[in-house]
């Protein structure tokens, strides 16, 4: 039959997928490309059976009723979109028919499972998985292949994987069903169904990550969501704004995720992985955040929209270090932003005026001080670790400013640096003068032998009172020896002049004693 051909054709593919590196970026694309090559999209069928694909269509559903009702396929039921959470399992689970021979030899093979009667329940329908806690995309990505294989073995015969549309056919064309589900998810976005895309990633929350009872409770009540899955799973408006070109379709898909809680996990309907989803928040702006939240969430008729906003903090609290802590600083709400803009416009008006009434610790000419005064008030609700370093540095620089100075912290910084440089140069000058002080000290000692009147004269000012200094003194230029020689020559000249004057007086018949008494 077809099941045995399927076993031979998918052994290598399953082994390659399971042994693949879980953190590889191309792991999902390679598996998807191989499935696309094997299954043509033109041959379509809605048959579902033991080997049903792991990605559920909106038309294929299993109601959480007794096992006689579970084996009948429900079309367009009221809970058709709520139990699809079972099917977010890796495509490697579809080839677990091979593994079932090793786990339970007495279990019927895939050939007999195709023609099993509708009244027979599966072997282990209510077995709880070992991991029942909610696993974030980071922890899912780092699971070893052995753990995944063990989980898939346990869940291989779950009712979600063994549902069938018409078991009376006693046959299931697996490629046609897979191609049908691929096309339903990729092309039927116009329907009011869950547009879950076929490429599975490591970030998909699998069926073994939550207990079966919780899934049953989710499918019974479509309006209520369990407290650990409602807001933390689906309300991602502050962190995942839709920046892609198909923003309208992505927003509508997000609405389908919120309207049908149990049919999705932490992943969006786009084929991107969790890394791409969570990295969008860093490149997003506040306007796109507010617009996306108001358009996609509030526009949709959701009875639990206030609960989504109320439990937003619970979604971020158990997250590991995958999402950076600086992300919350980027996600300031639009209200503080408007407050900052209004204050900035007021400050611009105040800068244009006289700037008389100002806080002494608030410097408006410095742009950094404005950000230091405003950023802590806007980021108190989110995360101040991103702005703490900047605020400390800025407040340190702004506190060093005096209230009356209008200079920026950079100018004061340079001014404080320039003061020690002036002190250094002044001290150097003093040291050079102290080294050169013995040389000027010799001049008074050498000139003390002379007239010692013109020693302190450093310049010549030609006035009426300077006649005696010019005649009797010596020019201050030259060394001490030159000064001494010139002083000696001046004394000799004065002596000669005095002697010539005395001779002239004697020759004229004057009184020489009376003249000497007047001159001396």
Curated annotation (Swiss-Prot):
Annotated region (Disordered), positions in chain: 109-165, 378-454, 468-496
Biological process, per Gene Ontology: conidium formation; sporulation resulting in formation of a cellular spore
Leader peptide range in chain numbering: none
InterPro entries linked to this entry: WetA
Amino acid composition bias (Low complexity), ranges on this chain: 445-454
Ranges of biased composition (kind: Polar residues): 109-118, 155-165, 378-392
Induction field: Expression is positively regulated by pcz1.
Compositional bias (Basic residues): 420-429
UniProt keyword list: Activator, Conidiation, Sporulation, Transcription, Transcription regulation
Function: BrlA, abaA and wetA are pivotal regulators of conidiophore development and conidium maturation. They act individually and together to regulate their own expression and that of numerous other sporulation-specific genes.
UniProt similarity note: Belongs to the wetA family.
Protein's recorded name: Developmental regulatory protein wetA
